[in-house]
From Swiss-Prot:
Source organism phylogeny: Archaea, Methanobacteriati, Methanobacteriota, Methanomada group, Methanobacteria
SUPFAM superfamilies: EF-G C-terminal domain-like (SSF54980), P-loop containing nucleoside triphosphate hydrolases (SSF52540), Ribosomal protein S5 domain 2-like (SSF54211), Translation proteins (SSF50447)
Chief subcellular location: cytoplasm
Molecular function in Gene Ontology: GTP binding; GTPase activity; translation elongation factor activity
Signal sequence coordinates: none
Keywords tagged on the record: Cytoplasm, Elongation factor, GTP-binding, Nucleotide-binding, Protein biosynthesis
Gene Ontology CC terms: cytosol; ribonucleoprotein complex
Protein name: Elongation factor 2
Amino acid sequence: MSRRDQMVKKIKDLMYKPDYIRNIGIVAHIDHGKTTLSDNLLAAAGMISSELAGDQRFLDFDEQEQERGITIDAANVSMVHSYEDNEYLINLIDTPGHVDFGGDVTRAMRAVDGAVVVVCAVEGVMPQTETVLRQALKENVRPVLFINKVDRLINELKLDDAELQNRFVKIIAGVNKLIKNMAPEQYKTEWQVKIEDGTVAFGSAYHNWAINVPEMLKTNITFKDIIQYCNEDNQKELAQKIKIEEVILGMVVEHLPSPKVAQEYRVPKIWSGDIESVEGQGMIATDSTSPLAVMVTDVSIDKHAGEIATGRVYGGSIEKGSEIFFVGSMSKARTQQVGVYMGPERINTDSVPAGNIVAITGARGAIAGETITDADHNIAPFESLEHISEPVVTVAVEAKNTKDLPKLIEVLRQVGKEDPTLRVEINEETGEHLIAGMGELHLEVIIYRINDKGLEVETSEPIVVYRETIAGTATNVEGKSPNKHNRFYIDIEPLSDDLMNAISEGEIPEGRVKGKELAKTFQEHGLDKDEAKKVWDVYKHSIFVNKTRGIQYLDEIKELLMEGFESALDDGPLANEKAMGIKISLMDAKIHEDAVHRGPAQVLPAIRKAVYGAIMLAQPTLMEPMQKVYISVPQDYMGAATREVQNRRGQIVEMGQEGDMSTIESKVPVSEMFGFAGDIRSAAEGRCIWSTENSGFERIPRELQNKIVKEIRERKGLTPEPYGPDHYLG
């Protein structure tokens, strides 16, 4: 039997033993060494040669990733590790650290139970470390810590034993502070990482060695010895004595939970159904004979196999050739193949049981976030995947040859399916195709992928996505239907920050409100008792409240009113951008008794015009997306770096000192960030480290608003000036 066949056989055996499975992700800030670490773990599992590990970038099997040297997608791999006389199946997902690809992290975190957080010993805890850790903890994923690039502290920064330990203590305290702030209440203390219990390891992924306290006790190797090995340039020998894979995978097996342990506390958090039901109990017990429950985390298109859906099996078993049901789209499909991953290749099996990561071919029509169950069964869906950031930059895409237009539409739909953080808008009337992404790099990669599918495209300059809101209030605004037989009266005011945050954090889910289920939550966030029971709709960070009493026929047009409210917010009156942060209350209504006179053609324009008119009466305001920008530069370049930020309308939030480096934390509008990479490099002569994180929307300075509104309207082919309230209400 070849080594590969042995490996396949082991993976197939271990799939059925949930106590011996670990589903883990590796998360970190960009360039802190995630993919290098993954490669080493694979080398150990006999997947790639150990000589090449570190340079191989095995999980980066997309050309773009190898070329840019960063991870763009989350890649899946399964491997077998022996620990204390038992073999374990470790399913590993490598995730991107670049802010533009945060959506992949969110999806990967839904599939795993534990995470190895990699932090660079030189840079310490960085903004993106915080973002990825927050995503992990939000999904109830337990962390352990690996401090990487320790050799650089010794060889480049020349730190001695005591200084090393100080640096480590500081990094660990930083990570634990984040865990304490962001972990679920019951795990704030239990999940803290500690040197003494082995939940923290140190090492160099590039040079293949790592150590933690249990390993020190086993090998008698101390930090003094490590400093000596590094100083004598003898890290190869060190890597033979303290093998990185033994330490990291040992830590994973010892401290991160098996599906059996994790599903008990994770399922209630990520699944919206009744935990006491048959399928609820099946998932909690990781029971492979209970009803099927799969959460799709990723869909990719393979040249040979077509659409491949990757997901986590939480309950039951998914079988080859079986009929399955998509809960979200209410449609059915038949699986062609099911299997697990080994590196980028899939190993097909007859079935994949609960607790595993599955690859399904033939699941046509699946999208990331979909829930799959047996064809003759319907279960409640998994909670939708919350992305921490929203798309903020848009480009228009055109096919170079007109004959390629149908292909362009097809390719855009494919790309949108593969990457749910991308918003693809295909406007068939204007013929405009827009893609909105997380930033400049995200869109560059998507365009490269479109070209890669054999399609030549031209793109516009990147355009920033704005939002509309209000700064004032308006009361008793009347909207009339075209036939004048229906009238609606609304009040409008800005939504409180407290409610906005609750919606952003996912405490209040977006969507039409059924009954009084959220009344208590609305009350906790500032609505009075009566109002809290009357919220009809939460949409794009705005809410629609029905404050009327005893209006005849209102229930019959309730759905139409919500549709009108939603479509008005989809493109606001100021610049046709989406509106947010608005509370609209329906105060009174006069509705025609004859159903013919109160159909969609009458109700929709009436409510839309009322909303538009009210917005224009309540000091309409444009909001722009902001990014936090973190810069670390030598002191001599501090002034130049600060000027670079201030020239872009940036505000300096905080400045600090780390050894001989200065740190600057600032907030800059996304519209001013194009070309920043080149400018900051030349300002600091290449000697700076910088990173960004999306930071929501803020109001545009008054003096710029008219100019920007005019530019947006002209770009969209609208009249240069927005219409006044009378246009909508007259």
